[in-house]
């Protein structure tokens, strides 16, 4: 650290690397503004001590699951929530916090808000207003202006602290000035966020989502991924600083063994897929598969409500297409040697830990890199330097600029474009391998809820999923399947049993030699489990594949009832929904059996596409409609009988709609206003009686 640079502590808590990447970006930019960031993960408690920290502290933290801290922040949150800490425990601490979340989830940025609130309760003071970035609309809309404002806030704080120290200013006056500065900063951030919001709203007024110019009478020129129109095409641009390169890449000799064999982490276990069944009819809108995996030879155990991370590769043809586009396909079997550039200007630079040594080029692109990741603006800024066509170079500059944020969202973020899509759209762009490796994030495992109970299926676990499809669009003309679901559907094709049909394995001595194998890791849930009190009633809301954990719940409850006939068991309500009764009513027969034997006491099903317009009878279309029709029972179960409600499925639409419907139900049935109803839900959450397993 230069003697002229002012130190601050930079902490991050990250689940999938976004908070870490943003913290590293802040650290890189710090030196340009006269600061030196000392970076640590929140889990690295041996590297920092907030009890003794006198420098400013900046915290970047994400939220995972149903408002839970990322794994790397769990101990930190638990530590600061210790009830024995006094109200001035952190009175010496001055901090700024940037929270990352997704507004598709009801507990938006909950980890960041929890840390923020608790630090305040312990006497810590903000020197800069907290920012909460929304991945649902684009993290950069808040992250970029928040980082820009951070440097002035740090300078003001350092100047104020030095002035206070030198003049021994009266504490009351100092507090008053600090509050005024805080209001000024909060006002500036609020104004900036409102400005961004107004820009975003105005840019979306055109139905196409982009701008358009009238070139001649009757002819309209519209913006596209590769073309801009006025005013953007004529604007001066504020583009991000060019990220400093930090990797040296060398291709060595060819790898002799199979270059695509996975080198699994220690926590992963290889398991055999013993069966695969299609649960939906061939004419269903989505294809749903159920897989059974044999975990009997592993130490893995689980409870209904837990999940499993499944390690999956990128599509091989997609990998080869990308390598071909980069001009290195013929070297796909060569070993890649990585080193940090000795002369890099990047302050925080290290080799990617997710790329093993002595890996082939093909292996790295198949198993290590998220090649489907939406390229961030910093990536686009780097691509500009490798683009020779002036028109293409200008367009990439626009897409990564402040002025082009609406076009970036509309043409890159919303259609979920990948680096391959961009390189196909901008043919004169020829980035080096090092640039690709520097910017592509780690390929993440995909998480699936257990759709079974280990007590009903010893040594086995079931998962259920839809085969995800991304339809063609102007920016990506070819249909694509989900990275994991597309791979799994091809992997199990030889053993797939279609709905209503039978699948016969070949007569062989050892079926495990021909059955497909995958690597999985256990991902226990902290709370999404059946109540320990079997007499407590439960309400389960799970349309589509959201029913998965509830099949495990019901299998588990059935086994409990069989083994403990004298024990009291509470009501079980299931609200399920799908499009068509005859096409995608998955687990229909099993639910019928659960009902017949009394394990499932109430089943309410809605079919969104089977509405009969010829009759006046209005049938429930979605799960929230059935909740409304059973409002009195919902209130009785939750409040008179202290029951639990579980919600599983799509966060963006279903979970939000169910949440809003419950607010209406509580308001109406309990005769309270909506604000009080929201507090009621918050109380249920706090007591772990309103639980969600949702995804976007």
Q: Would you name each region that the model predicts?
A:
Residues 1-696:
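FNR-like FAD-binding dehydrogenase module
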